[in-house]
């Protein structure tokens, strides 16, 4: 009821340490981004940041005691390297030049469905001169644009590390079953690509363990 919401708002504003624990699920619905934006403004409105124990906590995933460069190995990239923001994929496929993007590898993502400026993304994916490889478990919106569709393993079929959004625990997960059919994990895909491209760095000769 409106009265209850007003009373709850007053109790929140008057609390000794107004604190909000904000999860990730809220952002994954219609108008989710604006809902999250409004909620994150509440501590500032009531002065919660000036009170010990007050404020807001969202994801802790950026605080893991884990160095991602051990996996991404950016030191192996040639310099300089052009970087393309995946949130501007539509712009990259349609307007970026010098040189133009002519090949696209998609894994662990479905940009045709979730990337901003969807119309531009779909126009880019529809280009006749764009060679698109999709590594996927399902026939997603993006997979329908693939020139080559490679089967990917599920979480039950490969080793992985999981970092939590809400705590400081890193969990190692072992496969429950072997890969089904001809499916590969992300690691196996890029390890084999490196071998076919003549990249002999020992990093790519490691197993997933």
Task: Report the location of each language-model feature.
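Non-catalytic alpha/beta scaffold blocks inside enzyme catalytic domains
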Residues: 1-51, 59-209
